[in-house]
Amino acid sequence: MGGGGQPRESGEPGSSPAVYTWEEVQHHSSRNDQWLVIDRKVYNISQWAKRHPGGYRVIGHYAGEDATEAFTAFHPDLKFVQKFLKPLLIGELAATEPSQDRNKNAALIQDFHTLRQQAESEGLFQARPLFFLLHLGHILLLEALALLMVWHWGTGWLQTLLCAVMLATAQSQAGWLQHDFGHLSVFKKSRWNHLVHHFVIGHLKGASANWWNHRHFQHHAKPNIFKKDPDINMVDLFVLGETQPVEYGVKKIKLMPYNHQHQYFHLIGPPLLIPVFFHYQLLKIMISHRYWLDLVWCLSFYLRYMCCYVPVYGLFGSVVLIVFTRFLESHWFVWVTQMNHLPMDINYENHNDWLSMQLQATCNVEQSLFNDWFSGHLNFQIEHHLFPTMPRHNYHLVVPRVRALCEKHEIPYQVKTLPQAFADIIRSLKNSGELWLDAYLHK
């Protein structure tokens, strides 16, 4: 219809806009040929995707699809980013085409849109700077107390253990804080969020802002979807969900004894993710992608750390201390980040609407002062995934309306205790391993 599916970067001045069907749009979903739809407007992002500030992968995951809800969720200043879309506009959907693709529930999408508008009008996307300043303050205080303790009381086993625990706590809390700035949920201006994000993740944690952005936004865009969510790419060490184990079993893939994965998870999951895998991946990505600014921020962390601890522990002792700190931090990070997603539905792309997709892949953990602090408010993972730019101190305010909307449309809204959420990680790994073994032996 109309444009006949001919790709171009923009329409000719003065010409009437070309019109397309959903079928035509869906044909443009390959790596080098990508169209998407936002508010019924059709955009050709084939060339521009490589310049997308959030990374080419995250926007490419919506090629051939309606990206309206994702576009709204990720960008706090829609008017600002609209100017980047204008040169990419190639037409619009035909009047006979529905606003939603793939038979999505229009009533559900409209109800969620209304909920978001209500939250915006009530100021729930406005941050309280003091909240984040206090979180930064308690991180810096923990680091200062850890250093003062070993400087004043020496480097005995007890002092060293307490120092490592305090440093690991500071690192974990800095991880939650960088998450806030990375999601542009603190300052009104994105540039300030980016600047402080570099400081927190780079100077306070020794990691890369670009690496985190490109990886984490994919997870939010397509949570628990194979080949799109990097958080479920387990490099064949684990099989997840109910589909992948059967696939591996039928194909007789046995790179690991997956029926025992719920046991060896304790050996290679929490202990090694940050000290080994993340450090290797960070260094590789920063060098291969030439993230030189990120590398400078990262090196500033280690320079500061060595200046503080080499005088009391020596070079070797300081290295041992930071490795042990990363070991402790890694346990904290893995259990908290996996409890909301790993036990949920994990599958291939099924093109759900935003609300349904996020709820299938996400659960909450009960609210308490400890749970809020311990998880960086990721116990409200459902609300965070629905509204990634909402400041975390407002999650609890939108919970009743999200639950009511889910109840209205019969979408399960899961809330667990913290021990139950942790136990479900192991339970889901055990269940997936058993599915693999059954398929491996009998199919």
UniProtKB/Swiss-Prot annotation:
Any GO MF annotation of the entry: acyl-CoA (8-3)-desaturase activity
Compartmental location: Membrane
Stretches assigned to the Cytochrome b5 heme-binding domain: 17-94
GO biological process: unsaturated fatty acid biosynthetic process
Keywords, in A-Z order: Fatty acid biosynthesis, Fatty acid metabolism, Lipid biosynthesis, Lipid metabolism, Membrane, Oxidoreductase, Transmembrane, Transmembrane helix
Main localisation: membrane
E.C. designation(s): 1.14.19.3, 1.14.19.44
Catalytic activity as recorded in UniProt: (9Z,12Z)-octadecadienoyl-CoA + 2 Fe(II)-[cytochrome b5] + O2 + 2 H(+) = (6Z,9Z,12Z)-octadecatrienoyl-CoA + 2 Fe(III)-[cytochrome b5] + 2 H2O; (9Z,12Z,15Z)-octadecatrienoyl-CoA + 2 Fe(II)-[cytochrome b5] + O2 + 2 H(+) = (6Z,9Z,12Z,15Z)-octadecatetraenoyl-CoA + 2 Fe(III)-[cytochrome b5] + 2 H2O; (8Z,11Z,14Z,17Z)-eicosatetraenoyl-CoA + 2 Fe(II)-[cytochrome b5] + O2 + 2 H(+) = (5Z,8Z,11Z,14Z,17Z)-eicosapentaenoyl-CoA + 2 Fe(III)-[cytochrome b5] + 2 H2O; (8Z,11Z,14Z)-eicosatrienoyl-CoA + 2 Fe(II)-[cytochrome b5] + O2 + 2 H(+) = (5Z,8Z,11Z,14Z)-eicosatetraenoyl-CoA + 2 Fe(III)-[cytochrome b5] + 2 H2O
Known pathway: Lipid metabolism; polyunsaturated fatty acid biosynthesis
Record flagged with keyword Metal-binding: no
Membrane topology designation: Multi-pass membrane protein
Sequence intervals crossing the membrane: 130-150, 151-171, 267-287, 305-325
Top-level taxon: Eukaryota
Entry's family note: Belongs to the fatty acid desaturase type 1 family.
Notes on the domains: The protein sequence includes a number of characteristic features of microsomal fatty acid desaturases including three histidine boxes and an N-terminal cytochrome b5 domain containing the heme-binding motif.
Name under which the protein is recorded: Acyl-CoA Delta-6 desaturase
Organismal lineage: Eukaryota, Metazoa, Chordata, Craniata, Vertebrata
Gene name as annotated: fad1
